[in-house]
Amino acid sequence: MKVVATGDVYGPLFEEFTKDTGVTVEVLSMSSGEVLSKLRAEGGTPSADLWFGGGIDAFMSAKDDGLLEPVMFDAAADLGDEYKDADGYWYSKGITIVGFLLNNSLMEELGLTAPESWDDLTDSQYEGEIVMSNPAVSGTNYAVVNALLQAKGDQGWDYFDALNNNIAYYGKRGSDPKNKVSSGEFAVGISYIDASIEQAAEENDLTIVYPSDGMPWVPEGVAVFKNAENVDAAKYFVEWLFSNDDHLRQLAEIEQKSGIKVIKPSIEGIELSYHPSLLMTEDLSLFGSQRTEILDRFEPLMGDKAATE
């Protein structure tokens, strides 16, 4: 079984699947935006079987394009309705939350005050000192854009025009803000927040900020590609993962995230590392339907600040 995943850390989980089923697994690391572009380019003959991780907007778009295979299993009833497709085309294995990451030394050197809210990031003191990932390739940062547009309504694009004035670089990977703030290239990163970020903060004298006006969040998807060569194995993996809490706990440990508790509240042995009230109110149905329109407008805004390699 061939898998496209958002990282190469999932080996132990897939090894457990191989141990249980005898199905060997080959993993290729790729962001959700890249997967969607590749899937469309392949014209209905996917080179992989299973899509594991990435922002749910890309999964919604893939479903609309007829590129996914539905998977139905009894344990899906234990997952929150908003975290699974009603027709079984995708399921969420957790959520990614987003906040700010500050390089304390650089902030002090530049005389910057710590931002506390999304609006604070538009202050001119941060000009050239903010980094975020390109929302066209990072599902997490697309969620930031969509969530803030929902929250700010008619003023949403004015906000991003102002924010763009302070952003120096739009990275190609979701980890770029963490890496570039940790190395001291930039003072402020708009970044996912998980245990790996907490560890980086401790090791590199960084501060994590949970925005006072709410944290954007995005469900992370799992799906099977339509017309996949090993479609039955991929469908069984989805059932295998969600039907056994031990597998979900192993996944949470690998990812160093507690978001599966939001997806499946009945799971034991996992506690959320943040209060749910910090999460922004989001209409997830808009994540997929608005994706093309939003990215078409955001791309020229980024200009030559977007990473190309």
Predicted regions and their residues:
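A bilobed periplasmic-binding-protein/Venus flytrap-type ligand-binding module shared by bacterial periplasmic
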Residues: 101-106, 146-149, 218-230, 250-253
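A ligand-binding cleft/hinge motif common to bilobed small-molecule-binding domains
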Residues: 57-61, 182, 187-205, 254
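Periplasmic-binding protein-like
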Residues: 125-133, 159-164, 170-171, 202-226, 241-264
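Conserved C-terminal helix/tail region of periplasmic/extracytoplasmic solute-binding proteins
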Residues: 280-309
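Short beta-strand->loop
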Residues: 68-77, 90-92, 119, 204-216, ...
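Short, polar/charged alpha-helical segment
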Residues: 2-26, 100, 200
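Extracytoplasmic ligand-binding site segments that recognize negatively charged/polar headgroups
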Residues: 4-11, 30-34, 46-185
